[in-house]
Amino acid sequence: MSTKLVDHVEITVPTGKTYIQPVGLFINNQHVDSVHGGRVKVYSPSTEKLICEVADADEEDVDIAVKVARAAFQTDAPWRKFSSAQRGRCLSRLADCIEQNLEYLASIETLDNGKSITLARGDVQAAADCFRYYGGWADKDYGQTIETDIKRFAYTRHEPIGVCGQIIPWNFPFLMCAWKIAPAVACGNTIILKTAELTPLSALCLTKFVPECGFPPGVINVLSGDGRRCGNAISSHMDIDKVAFTGSTGVGRMVMRAAASSNLKKVTLELGGKSPNIVFNDADLDSAAVWTNYGIFYNSGQVCCAGSRVYVQEDVYDEFIKRMVAKAKTLKVGDPFAEDTFQGAQVSKQQYERIVSYIESGIAHGAKLEIGGKRHGNLGYFVEPTILSNVTEDMAVGKEEIFGPVLAVIKFKTIEEAIRRGNNSTYGLAAGVHTNNITNAIKVSNALEAGTVWVNCYNLLHHQIPFGGYKESGIGRELGSYGLTNYTQTKAVHINLGMDSPI
């Protein structure tokens, strides 16, 4: 095991403030170097400049983290002796630390990810709320007593799974830490979390608070590294009991194969989407224009549930496009540290180039460019909010996940057509319905094959409400009480109270 401690570097953000940034792997409540001393260069997508270098974990570092997590999960270890209420207090203290350091964490998130500072603050507060919520659940998730007959007593227990591997994406780095860590720890598991290679900084900042919040060594471990070595090692490790992954459907398949071919570990997957946002003739068009803009341009379009397909009923099609374009023109793109910026940078040059190539493909295949379509500014990976009309579902922009600020607009005639076309996707993460007819709202919501349906709104998530996908958008649910089921296994106990001998 690497015993070389790696402390931190100082980072100055564009506002002039200087913050402490941990750069080592967080294993056993210490920041340590990777075994082989590898480094990951971290760049700011808004400036294209190097921020710092962090430790690069490989298979050997994963092995070390698994060993300490397994040791922390042993029945005689301090963590296993914590009461459920004690676990809850640790999580609540972590929520307090996050709130007390909100500006620090949001600034690091904005520098590393490129999202606007206002969105980053919202993410950090939502993460604190999530930790506090699951802190409250820690002593409330229990089994049942089951009456069968007078000579037998039975009950169930919800027991932790064990050592859990967790792999998070780059679009919501800090918030995804909370979504993964909080329910797992509330249930009594130990975890090894892998950050996204592009955005490791805020998760490493979170680890500063773990020891002071009372978590014993080995309970929470955080590794920065790439998917090929670190992520694959977690997915295929024989001593990890469960893996939770958020990211693309393609990588989700790889995680699932690795989990199945190793020790058949339990899997939770929150994957991609090409979500339909359906606008009916009777909708409040101004309101719907706001929500469809928010549904695709929020977080620079880098949202798994982004409403990237907008279906508009034919009678209001032309007028609604005008209103969407008018709203898109009001959205400020640029410096993510400016308080009035709505849309920041795309996360990387590769992602920027991918988005631009989709726009070019759509136009080449007959889509009409209503607004945007090109780079914003000369520095940083900014893409203008882009709306394409006259899109058909055989175009790449109409059926593939772009993960950027690109909206495909498609015309429809009837409710039945809207449902059929909305469901015409391999994905099923989310959908939106805009109408003033409550009967149609419920009818369409019930018929759409999606894990979340928003009516007259979009992109509203909350830690109390489950989130996850149908079809190729994932397996399992995160958040709410449903999120606890990902991290527990049910044991049934039968007690003989005087039954006759069976033989």
UniProtKB/Swiss-Prot annotation:
Molecular function GO labels: aldehyde dehydrogenase (NAD+) activity
Keywords from the named record: NAD, Oxidoreductase, Phosphoprotein
Keyword Flavoprotein belongs to the record: no
Broadest EC class assigned to this enzyme: oxidoreductase
Binding site for NAD(+): 247-252
Annotated site (Transition state stabilizer): 171
InterPro entries, per database record: Ald_DH/histidinol_DH (IPR016161), Ald_DH_C (IPR016163), Ald_DH_CS_CYS (IPR016160), Ald_DH_CS_GLU (IPR029510), Ald_DH_N (IPR016162), Aldehyde_DH_dom (IPR015590)
EC code: 1.2.1.-
Residues annotated as transmembrane: none
Any single GO BP term: ethanol catabolic process
PROSITE patterns: ALDEHYDE_DEHYDR_CYS (PS00070), ALDEHYDE_DEHYDR_GLU (PS00687)
UniProt-listed CDD domains: ALDH_AldA_AN0554
Disulfide-bonded cysteines: none
Active-site residue numbers: 270 (proton acceptor), 304 (nucleophile)
Cellular compartments per GO CC: cytoplasm; cytosol; Golgi apparatus; mitochondrial matrix; nucleus
Residues the record lists as Phosphoserine modifications: 248, 501
UniProt xrefs under Pfam families: Aldedh (PF00171)
Keyword Oxidoreductase included in the entry's annotation: yes
Family indicated by similarity: Belongs to the aldehyde dehydrogenase family.
PANTHER family: ALDEHYDE DEHYDROGENASE-RELATED
Protein name according to UniProt: Putative aldehyde dehydrogenase-like protein C9E9.09c
Source species: Schizosaccharomyces pombe (strain 972 / ATCC 24843)
